[in-house]
Amino acid sequence: MPVPWEALIPSALLVTMFGVTGTLANITFRAQNQWKPPRYHLERWDEMMIARDNRLTGHNRGQTSDPVIPSRAASS
Amino acid sequence: MSTTKEQQAVGPQPHVAELGTTSAPLKSAAFFIGAYCKEFNEDFMLCKAESRDPAHCLKEGRRVTRCATDLITKMRENCLEQFESHWACLEQNNHQYYRCRTVERPLNTCMFEKLGLVKTIPGTPEGRKQIHEIENPVLKRQQK
């Protein structure tokens, strides 16, 4: 259709699709990390601490500041 | 539960409950643990330097655990709100200290007033201000 803005229609489609892709990717990453941004640049120390968090709370990103250890995790 | 050969070798040990705090609160409290438990931590590291055998440093390890548990309990009693907000900020920011300075300052002042503990970074060059005390650092987070 010969209107001045006809090229903007597929451009808008591309922008929208990139946006949807990015949003869905962000949602999948956050969903695996208890709705927090995922951890990155992890060293062996960080991996060991994350495994310890898993033993203490049941999830890699679970956190608690309670110094009392739950009985199911009693041997760290 | 049957004892292993190593457990039989060292004999019965006093039971000290392991610290149940996870990584973000520990990272938030790290420098205060360093200030509060300095002697016990240094004893443990010197003991480990003698021998890496786990059975060699059980006593020093128990002392470290008890001291850290004691400090976390005190922190929660006195500065719970600032502590919780600081480690929640760290959880959102890949556990990087430089991204959570605005939340760290109230925690440092609370810890100093209530418990007299100061965060100092060992190895800072002489005459240089501590990195967490610089008002406008060059390397900072993207957003304000």
Walk through the language-model features, giving the residues of each.
Chain B
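Mitochondrial intermembrane space
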Residues: M1-K144
